[in-house]
Design a protein with these regions (language model features):
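Catalytic core of soluble alpha/beta enzymes
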Residues: 218-356
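N-terminal capping/lid subdomain adjacent to the active-site entrance of alpha/beta enzymes
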Residues: 2-245, 250-252, 256-259, 263-266, ...
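Flexible, glycine/charged-enriched surface loops at secondary-structure junctions
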Residues: 82-83, 132-135, 220, 272-276, ...
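Short glycine/serine/threonine/alanine-rich loop segments
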Residues: 76, 130, 295, 343, ...
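Buried hydrophobic packing segments
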Residues: 116, 120-124, 334, 357-362
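Ligand-binding pocket scaffold of soluble enzyme catalytic domains
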Residues: 50, 341-344, 384
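Active-site pocket-lining/capping segments in soluble small-molecule metabolic enzymes
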Residues: 173-178, 356-395, 404-406
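Glycine-rich beta-alpha junction loops
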Residues: 13, 56, 327, 350-354, ...
């Protein structure tokens, strides 16, 4: 019997408010794009799950083709069976022989599988009438463990060790949920320090971030060392010693250049240096981290799979792990790996829809995995939220726990129509 669901894919593009908002030292392409997937439950009118693959600029047509190929793997499955065992569904998506040779554990096909599983998670949470963070945090520990594929992780973390991590924090889950609902989750302001902002704008945005309750900000760096030192001096003078200042190099440097550049900036008491070099150079990250100690290195948004996260942690290459709005199952694996080594997780959220999704993962981590918000923050960029049905809410420098069912990935129908490529009405001149 055929599966009782249908699906639709769309390429979505947004122009940044300024052509340089969100641009980094390695790329001045700040436009956001997404390959967007909607899975509809044909048995229940209006029941939909939404997932996407985020990117900058174009190339969505290639990613959409990958999503179509992955959807073909499950087109003959019943929706109920897919949702009943999300661990097995994930393994089906990533292990199928049709795509096993296409960059296993990474690449376009793997990213596409992430969009598919996330759309299913969105639908599962909506069926349960729960926000995703609460659905995950309410699962028994053994069920959470079954969501993770430990084949390539067990040399660092076994299923039994993962279960022990979850069981250790289980007794106070309800207490932590009450605290989350009352206080929210720390947010880090990424908007003040865009690389191409004037000194005057940098100063003003730093003051506004502090007035809004943020205790951490981020500056982009890496284009010019003299400029970076001047901008950091301004930010530190404005913010004082009690505001954490992180910097993001956007993969700009080679290893030796990174060590020299970071050393030249270290006097400004850097909270971390993000993405200093190629995301696939794990040994390079380790070399940088060891050379610039005690300045922490943060990375992970470009990690192709939890296997890379495992290796970064084994190499002591990072002081902070940054996850992104990628496959829920793999993010759970990464959260468990980080908890097992005591490394804080600070999700990246610098694009359309990322805040809406990663907040659920961070809140699940606090309640059910690490049990801590200490030294943690979710990145916040004040752009694109108006395009989503349940936009992320940040007040007094903290994310407020979303209470609407789902993962937060669902876009407004009007925004989907206005920003669909190539039929755009609100985005002119972007190719």
């Amino acid at each position: 019997m055929g599966a009782a669901f249908s699906y639709l894919t769309s390429e979505i593009r947004f122009a940044s408010p300024s052509r340089l908002d969100g641009a980094g030292a390695a790329s001045r392409d700040a436009d956001c794009a997404a390959a967007y997937l909607t899975i509809s439950d044909d048995a229940i009118d209006g029941a939909e799950g939404h997932g996407f693959v985020f990117s900058a600029g174009g190339s969505g047509d290639v990613q959409l083709a990958a999503i179509e190929a992955v959807m073909a793997i499950i087109e003959d499955r019943r929706l109920d069976s897919l949702l009943a065992d999300m661990g097995e569904t994930w393994r089906t998506l990533v292990d199928h022989t049709r795509r096993g040779w296409l960059a296993p554990d990474g690449g376009l096909a793997h990213r596409a599988a992430g969009a598919v599983i996330n759309a299913l998670w969105d639908l599962k949470a909506k069926r349960a009438g729960l926000p995703l963070w609460r659905l995950l945090a309410g699962m028994p520990s053994a069920e959470i463990v079954r969501l993770v594929d430990f084949r390539y992780l067990s040399d660092a973390l076994s299923a039994e060790e993962a279960l022990a991590i979850l069981e250790a924090v289980l007794p106070h889950r309800a207490q932590r949920e009450r605290r989350l609902l009352a206080e929210g989750y720390p947010a880090a302001a990424a908007s003040p320090g865009e690389l191409w902002y004037s000194d005057e704008l940098l100063e003003r945005l730093c003051r506004e971030a502090m007035a809004d309750g943020f205790t951490q900000i981020k500056l982009k760096v890496g284009a010019n060392l003299v400029d970076d030192r001047r901008r950091l001096a301004i930010a530190r003078e404005v913010c004082g010693p009690d505001i954490a200042i992180a910097v993001d190099a956007d993969r700009r440097w080679g290893v030796d250049e990174a060590v020299g550049w970071i050393s030249a900036l270290s006097e400004f008491d850097l909270h971390w240096v993000e993405d200093p070099t190629s995301p696939v150079d794990l040994l390079g990250h380790a070399a940088i981290a060891h050379a610039v100690t005690p300045v922490p290195i943060a990375t992970g948004e470009h990690a192709l799979s939890p296997v890379m996260v495992k290796q970064l942690l084994q190499l002591n290459a990072i002081g902070y792990l940054q996850i992104d709005a990628t496959a829920v199952n793999e993010n759970i694996a990464s959260l468990l790996l980080a908890a097992g080594t005591g490394v804080p997780v600070c999700p990246r959220a610098g694009g359309a829809g990322l805040s809406e999704v990663v907040q659920h993962l961070a809140m699940f981590d606090y309640i059910a995995v690490s049990g801590s918000m200490e030294g943690r923050a979710i990145e916040h960029v004040d752009r694109y939220h108006e395009h989503f049905v349940t936009p992320a809410e940040v007040r007094d420098g903290r994310y407020r726990a979303p209470l609407f069912p789902g993962s937060g990935a669902e876009m407004l129908p009007t925004s989907l129509g206005d920003h669909m490529w190539p039929m755009l009405s609100a985005l002119d001149g972007v190719a």
